[in-house]
Amino acid sequence: PLFAANMFAHHLARQLGTQEEGIIYIHHDQQRLGGQAYGRFTPAQRRGAVFIGKKDYSSKNKYALSLQPTASCHLEFSLVIKFSSSRISPEKLTNILKRSRFAGGQIIEFLEITTHAENELETALKKIKTGFAILDRQDLLIEYQQRKQINRVQAFTQLLALKTDALRAFFNDQNLSWISATNLGYALLEPLTDQRAGIRQAQDQENTAHAYAEPLTGIIQYFSLGEILRRNTEAEDDTWHNLQKLLWTYHW
């Protein structure tokens, strides 16, 4: 959910009249939504009257609904957002959250919002205490591709298919686990244009630019926040002395 989290931070920044400069996503829990098909979990859109139109039925059986190519879940997470302004009102942010949505989903509950100075990132993370930070692991993908002498797509699919023992043996890292793929953004497939029928206009624009795009998928790792904070204080191991590298930043 990194891209969704970044867009959520972008939304909050616009509402606050400032800019976001990075996010840290801490995963706590997830409940996948879907159904069972032939004994296997299917993360398809749940069927309901609100999702049904004449085009939603199977082309082969006019009485059968086709599965929708979407997946959804309930999420519990913590989000650390770096804003360019140091004057952020927790009260104003609370009011914004009450009327906001995350990735199109309803925000059912959130805890007290706290603000910290830029040099207090460790304090902010210690307040969260537990969970799993999301790390960029494109280094694993590059190393796997180079050692196997295969193309990037082959390396991507093979790396994700490795079991934990094989993964740790290949990279000689006994702590390596919880590798996954996620959407990191989008790349345009064509030039932007506002000359297209059916474009949903932005709230503050008469003409909104539009372009078809493809997702950019990357390798990430879920890593224990508690372990990061523990290593942060170890003098002999400087891997996590700089907590700023947990920040995900985006470019347009």
Locations of regions flagged by a protein language model:
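A broadly used, surface-exposed interaction patch
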Residues: 33-70, 76
